[in-house]
């Protein structure tokens, strides 16, 4: 789904609007191996304060699930950069698994990550994703045992998403040593590519994770925070993603 050494920017759909999200996607796609587009949800339990607030801003402005697909369809008119949708299971269940995945595929999504769907309960989801030709991505935490990590790797057809730390999303000044130990352990077990997320906000952190064996690194909260406080978010977002990707010298 992405080249080794890729940066994977995360953006929340509809924060602060449909039109701005499309501008943000187009600003980062040049430097992204893959884009993760989050669907706003009222109880984003895996996310920290920064991304929670982005979900609430979008929902408060009247953002609906169908708006996510509308953004993606418009983005596909301009870019072929792979996109995975990140969501919680409630919107998938309420829509219907087959209908949700069918609309995701039709709008141009390449894969789906359902944060709170464990592999052991993902049978219907996996069958529907395979039928639609969508890649699946599952999360693994630093304390995930080896045997369960093998199950997660087997169920993932896109990549395995390694959580770098214990806790929720949110930029950290330093990543714990357990993050790098986890990457090295997963590298020995998983056949899929590995992307690491949660807590990453700096280029040196991206480089350290890639050096430890990650194929891609996800950055979310640092970008969402930039968007929320900037007077020129499109240009600042582009520069930040370029810097995180290692392309800053080319600007």
UniProtKB/Swiss-Prot annotation:
Q: Which UniProt keywords apply?
A: Amino-acid biosynthesis, Aromatic amino acid biosynthesis, Lyase, Tryptophan biosynthesis
Ranked from the top, the taxonomy reads: Archaea, Methanobacteriati, Methanobacteriota, Thermococci, Thermococcales
Could you give a single Gene Ontology term from the biological process aspect? Answer: L-tryptophan biosynthetic process
Write down the SUPFAM superfamilies for this protein, in alphabetical order. Ribulose-phoshate binding barrel
The record's section on InterPro entries has: Aldolase_TIM, RibuloseP-bd_barrel, Trp_synthase_alpha_AS, Trp_synthase_suA
Q: Which domain of life is it from?
A: Archaea
> Which residues constitute the catalytic centre?
36 (proton acceptor), 47 (proton acceptor)
EC identifiers of the protein: 4.2.1.20
Origin species, per record, is Thermococcus kodakarensis (strain ATCC BAA-918 / JCM 12380 / KOD1)
Q: What is the reaction catalyzed?
A: (1S,2R)-1-C-(indol-3-yl)glycerol 3-phosphate + L-serine = D-glyceraldehyde 3-phosphate + L-tryptophan + H2O
**Pfam family of the protein (one):** Trp_syntA
Q: What is this protein called?
A: Tryptophan synthase alpha chain
